[in-house]
Amino acid sequence: MTVYERLDRLFEQNNGILKTAQVLENGIAKSTFYAYVRLRGAEQAAHGVYVSPDAWTDAMYLLHLRCAQAVFSHESALFFHDLTDREPSPYSITVRTGYNPAALQADGVKVYTIKKELHGVGIVTLNTPFGNPVPVYDMERTVCDLIRSRSGIETQTFQNALKQYAKRKDKDLRKRMRLHIQHRYCY
């Protein structure tokens, strides 16, 4: 199998999205990869992230690859948990305090920051509509985030999300209370 065939297979295995780090892990030189990118017409979607010309672009997954510490939250998490019928625009993510979100904000991403101790609380991995895994805050954490940030959320989105959450059979009120008691997270 030639190097280009191996790269074709890597793109195929990764739904048309490939990171330079993945190429290097497979023992392929950067110069060979860049020549392949030019020849095949792949596009650079972000630093070190390339998309095949025949692949559907999964913007949520690309955002995750671009900023590994980003966790989908607020309106974006509502979408993942079926607590809203609207696709999020712009995407909402949460990063640790100290991360410089200027480049993400310039690209239209709504960025929230939170202290390091709370950043990892309630993270689950869910699939985007394209089937790619991304980190998302769980339903209880998402409701707490909405309550904390309610002044920056559309009133209709906020009310509908709380109504949908209240109707859910799989909600975990004890978990929400633990978030409140242990971390003083929900008001």
Q: Each PLM stretch: what is its role?
A:
Residues 1-13:
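A detector for short, charged/polar N-terminal pre-domain segments
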Residues 6, 15-26, 37, 45, ...:
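Nucleic-acid-binding surface
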Residues 40:
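Glycine-centered, phosphate/nucleic-acid-interacting loop/turn motifs that mediate DNA/RNA or nucleotide
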